[in-house]
Amino acid sequence: MNFYDVQITTDLGEIVVLQVCAYSESEAELTAISMVENGEANVMGTYVTGCFVLG
């Protein structure tokens, strides 16, 4: 597994950057999107090791 930095822009225009541990870039992106959509982006755990909101 590798660490990937995934940047997502929400519907409100906020930029969220998650550091996700995953087997591939696409898996990291899907995990990050799911976490943001479910309101779990601030939950540190097995897959998400860092979360930053830029604006």
Summary of predicted features, one role per range:
Residues M1-V16:
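Short aromatic-glycine-(Arg/Gly/Cys) micro-motifs in beta-strand/loop hairpins
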Residues E14-E25:
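A short, exposed loop/beta-hairpin motif centered on an aromatic-Gly-Thr core
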Residues Y4, L18-Q19, A41-M44:
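Intrinsically disordered, low-complexity Ser/Thr- and Pro-rich stretches
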